[in-house]
């Protein structure tokens, strides 16, 4: 029986269908302009950009210009690239312009779709960012699509790893900037560690289109971008605690695979306390006393390292290092490290060299970074399953765009076996059968371990005509993917998310030409061989089509339906035929964790014999329910993490905005004076409380405070002994004395140097205290969960205590700045080598690329600024024997270097 909702959808279409139909009027209007645009000369078409900008200046909106602007881009793409955006691509572009996520299947031309809203929004002159998952895609897309923008008079920049600040500044100044999500986030953090506005590279956050938006805004939401510096070596502590874990028995701890958590039981806690006491590591009586917070953190990490992290699944050991394996893609992530001591715990477990922990200097999550943009949109092939999350967290609606050609892929029901052995035997038989009939096959696994297990089984069965694509062999990855569509090819791959490469039936002709003709010079011979390769690939494509297209065989279900859908989506691109099927067993991770006993009992009752499989839509539905549970749990985790991160983010925004104001201000003297006066008021009110009798005044303490914060020896006890003196009189006298001393120093230094000194001291002190504050919040976060046992809401407690810590930061800032400025002296510089900045490193555990963009070289927080001869504040650190930047021709040490604050 059809439900009322189903009947309504049948009559009126779904909400998605209705929204897509709503764009048809504008699509028709764009199509109506096509002949007019074709008739324009190249110059006249390019001149449309100036015309549109003039119309914007006269009061028109971007929405008013959408139809003609899209028509211009379509014609430019046809002339420059030979590509004409289809009607569905125009719809995809409108969805992006309207701050939504455009879900378009693999091979539907998302890269070209982005050019439409990018051009339209770039007309506003505020800069548009197109976000990709790796440097290769950023450069490829900027190179290709930049030709369209260039033809229309817009500039295109690309941000990749290894650029100088000047190159980055130029790229961000362009109308359109292609960049990876990591580079954007790190540039934002680095900009907010600089001391001059001119040193900053980004110019604002207007409009961003995020490619693979589900990977970046969902998969990576739990892994912040971090810039860090090293702490002291604590390898002895890690090794000592690591040695305790094997001494525990199974009843000493509880493991929850679903929640990825490990906790000690009461017996385990007692045993651990005795071991820690013997090692001299336990303070007080209980492990959970507040002074043992750091030790609790270390023992929990050690337990997780032994009981939750599996070698060759979660990480591998290579060259005496722990290398993380990405759970989504199966790729190695060299240089990436687990944070908060977890990586060191794994190093201790595997007896490899323990690298020192890092202190966080600056961090931001992608959730909070991308929410800074005035307009945000995204593209992906798989977003519908995460629609609720996109709506709740980012305010983004997911709109499914129909394919240009109907999808011909057959998605078959799962085959479920009782044991993994039976499942693998069936998979091997299926692989051999597909190979014999010439059907290209992509075999998806969930980990390196599983892909190598299957490869070994295939070899033992006498079949060796396959390629393995996983973290161990990623150097050959591009070529393997390029040939995965050749008839009879068998490619075993860990999860294919974020690969960024289409599997073309018959193989990729461009990749073959690049590889086979790399040494052949341009000319008739090369042209003939290129033609031959293209003809051969076309014949192979026809053969693959006759065999049924690409067959995606998955050996296990991932806990996320989206990752499964990404794997399926590799087949059936651009209307090609294809097939997808999942082979499962009760012993698979997902089945084992979610109700496998019940299903195993049911299969036994059905009388399932060895080697037989059950295929039924009910099984698919049961698995989908299990996956939905996991997805809901993961969403709750991300939502909860965001609530905590929002507390830090609000404070981060205040600090970063304050830094910008300090950098932009002509002088910070008024700010410094306000800080000084607040410190005076604080110490006077503390030592001389309101309405207190003179005998209750702590004048000795006040005298000491004035000495500590202002470097002045004032006769406070003598003032207090005067007849009829009031607390206001003492406040006025202290203020007058401090102001006079500050004015005398300012006159002695001169206004130019004093401004430089004040700004430098305030910014550097603020940065130092902010870093300490981040560490304090991390520590608070690690223990706040225990408040739940006292029937108090941990989040509210965290908000309250984080606010108190922030207020303390502001008090410390006022005191530290006041104390430092009242002590700083101009001294003749003694010969010494310039001190280098401490090493800093960017980190981000990236669930997509596995490419180590940020571990190659230190990320220094302060890059050299452009030097203005008239502005000593712009010179930064100058070597003693360098020519003085003022242009005098003297060495710095004999000119402005004589004095150093």
Curated annotation (Swiss-Prot):
<keyword id="KW-0653">Protein transport</keyword>
<dbReference type="InterPro" id="IPR020937">
    <property type="entry name" value="SecA_CS"/>
</dbReference>
<dbReference type="GO" id="GO:0005829">
    <property type="term" value="C:cytosol"/>
</dbReference>
<dbReference type="InterPro" id="IPR011115">
    <property type="entry name" value="SecA_DEAD"/>
</dbReference>
<keyword id="KW-0997">Cell inner membrane</keyword>
<feature type="binding site">
    <location>
        <position position="884"/>
    </location>
    <ligand>
        <name>Zn(2+)</name>
    </ligand>
</feature>
<dbReference type="GO" id="GO:0031522">
    <property type="term" value="C:cell envelope Sec protein transport complex"/>
</dbReference>
<keyword id="KW-0479">Metal-binding</keyword>
<protein>
    <recommendedName>
        <fullName>Protein translocase subunit SecA</fullName>
        <ecNumber>7.4.2.8</ecNumber>
    </recommendedName>
</protein>
<comment type="function">
    <text>Part of the Sec protein translocase complex. Interacts with the SecYEG preprotein conducting channel. Has a central role in coupling the hydrolysis of ATP to the transfer of proteins into and across the cell membrane, serving both as a receptor for the preprotein-SecB complex and as an ATP-driven molecular motor driving the stepwise translocation of polypeptide chains across the membrane.</text>
</comment>
<keyword id="KW-1278">Translocase</keyword>
<keyword id="KW-0067">ATP-binding</keyword>
<dbReference type="GO" id="GO:0008564">
    <property type="term" value="F:protein-exporting ATPase activity"/>
</dbReference>
<dbReference type="InterPro" id="IPR036266">
    <property type="entry name" value="SecA_Wing/Scaffold_sf"/>
</dbReference>
<keyword id="KW-0862">Zinc</keyword>
<dbReference type="GO" id="GO:0046872">
    <property type="term" value="F:metal ion binding"/>
</dbReference>
<dbReference type="InterPro" id="IPR014018">
    <property type="entry name" value="SecA_motor_DEAD"/>
</dbReference>
<feature type="binding site">
    <location>
        <position position="886"/>
    </location>
    <ligand>
        <name>Zn(2+)</name>
    </ligand>
</feature>
<dbReference type="GO" id="GO:0005886">
    <property type="term" value="C:plasma membrane"/>
</dbReference>
<dbReference type="GO" id="GO:0065002">
    <property type="term" value="P:intracellular protein transmembrane transport"/>
</dbReference>
<dbReference type="Pfam" id="PF02810">
    <property type="entry name" value="SEC-C"/>
</dbReference>
<dbReference type="GO" id="GO:0043952">
    <property type="term" value="P:protein transport by the Sec complex"/>
</dbReference>
<dbReference type="InterPro" id="IPR011116">
    <property type="entry name" value="SecA_Wing/Scaffold"/>
</dbReference>
<keyword id="KW-0813">Transport</keyword>
<feature type="binding site">
    <location>
        <position position="502"/>
    </location>
    <ligand>
        <name>ATP</name>
    </ligand>
</feature>
<feature type="binding site">
    <location>
        <position position="89"/>
    </location>
    <ligand>
        <name>ATP</name>
    </ligand>
</feature>
<dbReference type="Pfam" id="PF21090">
    <property type="entry name" value="P-loop_SecA"/>
</dbReference>
<dbReference type="GO" id="GO:0017038">
    <property type="term" value="P:protein import"/>
</dbReference>
<dbReference type="InterPro" id="IPR000185">
    <property type="entry name" value="SecA"/>
</dbReference>
<feature type="binding site">
    <location>
        <begin position="107"/>
        <end position="111"/>
    </location>
    <ligand>
        <name>ATP</name>
    </ligand>
</feature>
<dbReference type="Pfam" id="PF07516">
    <property type="entry name" value="SecA_SW"/>
</dbReference>
<dbReference type="InterPro" id="IPR014001">
    <property type="entry name" value="Helicase_ATP-bd"/>
</dbReference>
<feature type="binding site">
    <location>
        <position position="895"/>
    </location>
    <ligand>
        <name>Zn(2+)</name>
    </ligand>
</feature>
<dbReference type="InterPro" id="IPR011130">
    <property type="entry name" value="SecA_preprotein_X-link_dom"/>
</dbReference>
<dbReference type="InterPro" id="IPR004027">
    <property type="entry name" value="SEC_C_motif"/>
</dbReference>
<feature type="binding site">
    <location>
        <position position="896"/>
    </location>
    <ligand>
        <name>Zn(2+)</name>
    </ligand>
</feature>
<dbReference type="InterPro" id="IPR027417">
    <property type="entry name" value="P-loop_NTPase"/>
</dbReference>
<dbReference type="Pfam" id="PF01043">
    <property type="entry name" value="SecA_PP_bind"/>
</dbReference>
<keyword id="KW-0547">Nucleotide-binding</keyword>
<dbReference type="Pfam" id="PF07517">
    <property type="entry name" value="SecA_DEAD"/>
</dbReference>
<keyword id="KW-0472">Membrane</keyword>
<keyword id="KW-0963">Cytoplasm</keyword>
């Amino acid at each position: 029986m059809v439900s009322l909702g189903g009947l309504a959808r049948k009559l009126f279409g779904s909400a998605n269908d209705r929204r897509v139909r709503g764009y048809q009027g504008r699509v028709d209007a764009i199509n109506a302009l096509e002949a007019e645009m074709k008739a324009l000369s190249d110059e006249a078409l390019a001149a449309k950009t100036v015309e549109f900008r003039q119309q914007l200046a006269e009061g028109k909106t971007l929405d008013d210009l959408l139809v003609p602007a899209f028509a211009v881009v379509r014609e430019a793409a046809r002339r420059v690239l030979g590509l004409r955006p289809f009607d569905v691509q125009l719809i995809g572009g409108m969805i992006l312009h309207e701050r939504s996520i455009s879900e378009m299947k693999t091979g539907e031309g998302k890269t070209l779709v982005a050019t439409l809203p990018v051009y339209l929004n770039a007309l506003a002159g505020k800069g548009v960012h197109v976000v990709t998952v790796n440097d290769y895609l950023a450069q490829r897309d900027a190179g290709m699509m930049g030709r369209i923008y260039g033809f229309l008079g817009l500039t295109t920049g690309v941000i990749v790893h290894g650029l100088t600040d000047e190159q980055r500044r130029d790229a961000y100044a362009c109308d359109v900037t292609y960049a990876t999500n990591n580079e954007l986030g790190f540039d934002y953090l680095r900009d907010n560690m600089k001391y001059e506005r001119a040193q900053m590279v980004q110019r604002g956050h207007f409009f961003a289109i995020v490619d693979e938006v589900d990977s970046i805004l969902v998969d990576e939401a739990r892994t912040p971008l971090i810039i860090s510096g090293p702490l002291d070596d604590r390898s002895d502590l890690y090794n000592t605690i690591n040695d305790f874990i094997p001494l525990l028995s199974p009843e000493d701890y509880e493991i929850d695979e679903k929640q990825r958590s490990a906790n000690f039981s009461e017996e385990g806690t007692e045993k651990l306390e005795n071991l820690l006491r013997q090692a001299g590591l336990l303070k007080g009586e209980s492990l959970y006393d507040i002074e043992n917070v750091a030790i609790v953190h270390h023992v929990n990490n050690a337990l997780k390292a032994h009981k939750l992290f599996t070698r060759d699944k979660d990480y591998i050991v290579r060259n005496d290092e722990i290398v993380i394996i990405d759970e989504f893609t199966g790729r190695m992530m060299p240089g990436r490290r687990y944070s908060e001591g977890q990586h060191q715990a794994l190093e201790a477990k595997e007896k490899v060299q323990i690298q020192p922990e890092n202190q966080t200097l600056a961090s931001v999550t992608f959730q909070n970074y991308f929410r800074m943009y005035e307009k945000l949109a995204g593209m992906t092939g798989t977003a519908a399953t995460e629609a609720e999350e996109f709506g709740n967290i980012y305010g983004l609606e997911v709109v499914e765009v129909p394919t240009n050609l109907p999808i011909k892929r057959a998605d078959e029901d799962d085959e479920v076996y009782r044991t993994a052995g039976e499942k693998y035997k069936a998979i091997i038989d299926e692989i051999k059968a597909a190979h014999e009939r010439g059907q290209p096959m992509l075999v998806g696994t969930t980990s390196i371990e599983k892909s190598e297990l299957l490869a070994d089984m295939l070899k033992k069965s006498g079949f060796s005509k396959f390629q393995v694509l996983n973290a161990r062999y990623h150097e050959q990855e591009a070529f393997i993917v390029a040939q995965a569509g050749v008839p009879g090819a068998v490619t075993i791959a860990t999860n294919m998310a974020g690969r960024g490469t289409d599997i073309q039936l018959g193989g990729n002709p461009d990749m073959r030409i690049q590889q086979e003709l790399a040494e052949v010079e341009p000319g008739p011979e090369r042209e003939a061989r290129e033609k031959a390769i293209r003809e051969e690939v076309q014949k192979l494509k026809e053969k693959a089509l006759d065999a049924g297209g690409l067959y995606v065989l998955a050996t296990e279900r991932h806990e996320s339906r989206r990752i499964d859908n990404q794997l399926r989506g590799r087949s059936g691109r651009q209307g090609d035929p294809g097939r997808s099927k999942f082979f499962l067993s009760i012993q698979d991770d997902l089945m084992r964790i979610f109700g496998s006993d019940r299903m195993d009992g049911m299969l036994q009752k059905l009388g399932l014999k060895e080697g037989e499989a059950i295929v039924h839509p009910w099984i698919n539905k049961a698995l989908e329910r299990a996956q939905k549970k996991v997805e809901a749990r993961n969403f709750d985790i991300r939502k909860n993490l965001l609530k905590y991160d929002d507390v830090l983010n609000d404070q981060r925004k205040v600090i970063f905005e304050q830094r910008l104001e300090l950098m932009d201000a002509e002088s910070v003297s008024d700010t410094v004076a306000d800080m000084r006066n607040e410190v005076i008021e604080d110490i006077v009110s503390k030592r001389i409380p309101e309405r207190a009798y003179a005998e209750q005044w702590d004048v000795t303490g006040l005298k000491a405070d004035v000495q500590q914060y202002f470097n002045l020896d004032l006769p406070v006890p003598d003032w207090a002994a005067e007849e009829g003196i009031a607390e206001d009189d003492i406040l006025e006298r202290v203020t007058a004395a401090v102001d006079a001393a500050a004015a005398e120093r300012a006159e002695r230094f001169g206004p130019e140097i004093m401004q430089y000194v004040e700004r430098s001291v305030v910014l550097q002190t603020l940065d130092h205290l902010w870093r300490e504050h981040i560490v304090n919040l991390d520590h608070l976060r690690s223990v706040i969960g225990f408040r739940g046992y006292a029937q108090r809401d941990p989040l509210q407690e965290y908000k309250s205590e984080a606010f108190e810590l922030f207020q303390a930061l502001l008090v410390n800032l006022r005191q530290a700045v006041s104390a430092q400025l009242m002590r700083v002296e101009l001294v003749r510089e003694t010969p010494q080598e310039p001190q280098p900045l401490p090493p800093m490193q960017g980190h981000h555990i990236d669930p997509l690329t596995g490419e180590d963009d940020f571990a190659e070289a230190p990320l220094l927080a302060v890059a050299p600024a452009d030097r203005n001869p008239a502005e000593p504040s712009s010179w930064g650190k100058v070597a003693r024997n360098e020519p003085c930047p003022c242009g005098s021709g003297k060495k710095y040490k004999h000119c402005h270097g004589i004095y150093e604050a």
